[in-house]
Amino acid sequence: MKIDITLKITPKMVKDAQGNEKKALVGHLGTHFDVMDKEFPLDYTERKAVVFDVSHVKDREIDISDIAIDQVEKEMFVAFYTGFIETVGYGTKEYFSKHPQLSNELLEELLKRNISMIGIDFTGVRRGKEHT
């Protein structure tokens, strides 16, 4: 089964991005891959997946206890829905500086389970210097 993770780009989102404090490059609004290695085989995009709705998590890191970790299997694509972009708008100061983040413990557990990809609807799995 394939899950459509398309984010509908509305005229308001485009207008907000054009007037934000930190200009976003054209074409960077929407889904993309941040690849840590130099190669990214296309078959990595065809995986079993699970999407965790963590939109209830506010003012703290997203942690292992916020998801059903037992649903995560080897080579799985694990996605997190926060709804953050709908709250603060794409490209705003808050979008870049106050976005949710995954706890180090959660990231370590996902790596231990040998997942293939992490999907998020916010700027990065960590903030600041830990952004990558």
Segments predicted by a language model, with ranges:
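Active-/binding-site microenvironments in catalytic and ligand-binding cores
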Residues: 1-132
